[in-house]
């Protein structure tokens, strides 16, 4: 088989775009905690010394947005001008309006309830009432490369970025700063990951730190080597002998965070999902309540794809769903198994339709999405972390899928 190199990247919670995502999701959580039916679309721009919040919110709740911004920035680690940003003294501006009544009309009373047809529950089904918050297409993906059923490149990149933040916070490498990035290149033999080719780690650091004598050895010893050891402990077989490690390839990374680059909500959508291994519909997640199918349907598609793989119906599965704004029922469902299906793909698609209700209200109900759980999703991937709050990572429909597929 042909041998190819595939690369995925991750960033730490201190990357400017991830600060923005975290702020947006923290505001969302604060509103959902007080009003689970809040309609929220919050965008954040962070730059040198300033944070700007904008968007649309319709709610009965109050949230102290400026204080939430400051607390979030400080919790990430930006607490001093020496680090390029200080959450205690930065400027915060807030410009929030209400959700458009034209959008609200379609979400509150779906096309099906306005005489456009009836969804599977039949007349009077309450799940027919809520329409999709926008048109669009969303993808979900799963594969058997890791125990979490995620692609190995993004899985490993996230492990490295989490470890990079961990050694900064626990003082193992005390001179690190919050901003950081990781990148992993893995060699594939056909569809099988066989060898680690290259690891890139870039981390913001205090001034006066020598790359060759201090930073690079510390990163290898305290970040990369423990993470690679963890792969073996998790039963992931990968040849890691002789891999290339590049640490801060520019030679210096003292200016980082919002001083180095402006950050925006929703600008790391490939890192948030599958590291480029699967397609993406284009919609970002952070700052959006679950009436926005950009978020809730993407979570549902991960749930669907993961259950298909866990059920043994395929070893790789990508699922696409599509919606029209204001309509409850999806307008399209597409399943791709890349030649790995154990039954006809048509049977898998039919089984998905029988087992999963993909109307927005049903997704919100089944995944219990009206909870303040979203700040935890903002860094290190929305998928592949099996936390109790991440209900879309459950493999609780495998038996139903197997039965529906006729196995």
Curated annotation (Swiss-Prot):
Location(s), subcellular: Cytoplasm
Gene Ontology terms: biological process: one-carbon metabolic process; S-adenosylmethionine biosynthetic process
Annotated region (Flexible loop), positions in chain: 99-109
Entries under SUPFAM superfamilies matching the protein: S-adenosylmethionine synthetase
Gene3D superfamilies for this protein: 3.30.300.10
UniProt xrefs under InterPro entries: ADOMET_SYNTHASE_CS, S-AdoMet_synt_C, S-AdoMet_synt_central, S-AdoMet_synt_N, S-AdoMet_synthetase, S-AdoMet_synthetase_sfam
First-listed, main subcellular location of the protein, grouped into a coarse class: cytoplasm
Textual note on the cofactor: Binds 2 divalent ions per subunit.
Residues that coordinate or bind K(+): 43
Protein's pathway: Amino-acid biosynthesis; S-adenosyl-L-methionine biosynthesis; S-adenosyl-L-methionine from L-methionine: step 1/1
Subunit structure: Homotetramer; dimer of dimers.
Protein's name in the database: S-adenosylmethionine synthase
The organism of origin for this protein: Streptomyces fradiae
């Amino acid at each position: 088989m042909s041998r190819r190199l595939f690369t995925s990247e991750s960033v730490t919670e201190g990357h400017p775009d991830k600060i923005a995502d975290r702020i947006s999701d923290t505001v969302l959580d604060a509103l959902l905690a007080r009003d689970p039916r809040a309609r929220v679309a919050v965008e954040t721009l962070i730059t040198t010394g300033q944070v700007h919040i904008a968007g649309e919110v319709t709610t009965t709740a109050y949230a102290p947005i400026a204080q939430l911004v400051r607390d979030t920035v400080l919790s990430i680690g930006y607490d001093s001008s020496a680090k390029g940003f200080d959450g205690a003294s930065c400027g915060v501006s807030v410009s929030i309006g209400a959700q458009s009544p034209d959008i609200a009309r379609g979400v509150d009373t779906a096309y099906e309830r306005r005489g456009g047809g009836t969804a599977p529950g039949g007349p009077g089904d309450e799940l027919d009432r809520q329409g999709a918050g926008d048109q669009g297409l969303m993808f979900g993906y799963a594969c058997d490369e890791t125990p979490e059923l995620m692609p190995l490149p993004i899985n490993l990149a996230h492990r490295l970025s989490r470890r990079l933040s961990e050694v900064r916070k626990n003082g193992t490498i005390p001179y690190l700063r919050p901003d950081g990035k990781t990148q992993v290149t893995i060699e594939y033999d056909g569809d099988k990951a066989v060898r680690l080719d290259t690891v890139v780690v870039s981390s913001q650091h205090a001034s006066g730190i020598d790359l060759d004598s201090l930073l690079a050895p510390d990163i290898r010893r305290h970040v990369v080597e423990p993470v690679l050891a963890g792969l073996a402990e998790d039963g992931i077989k990968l040849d890691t002998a002789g891999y290339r490690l590049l640490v801060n390839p520019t030679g210096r990374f003292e200016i980082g965070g919002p001083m180095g680059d402006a950050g925006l909500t929703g600008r790391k959508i490939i890192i948030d999902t599958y590291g480029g291994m699967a397609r993406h519909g284009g919609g970002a997640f952070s700052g959006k309540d679950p009436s926005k199918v950009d978020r809730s349907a993407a979570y549902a598609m991960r749930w669907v794809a993961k259950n298909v793989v866990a059920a043994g119906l395929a070893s790789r599965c990508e699922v696409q769903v599509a919606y029209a704004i204001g309509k409850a029922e999806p307008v399209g469902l597409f399943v791709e198994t890349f030649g790995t299906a154990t039954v006809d793909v048509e049977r898998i698609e039919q089984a998905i339709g029988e087992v999963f209700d993909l109307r927005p209200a049903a997704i919100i109900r089944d995944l219990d999405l009206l909870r303040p759980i979203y700040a935890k999703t903002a860094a290190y991937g929305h998928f592949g972390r099996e936390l109790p709050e991440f209900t879309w990572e459950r493999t609780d429909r495998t038996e139903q899928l197997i039965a529906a597929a006729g196995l």
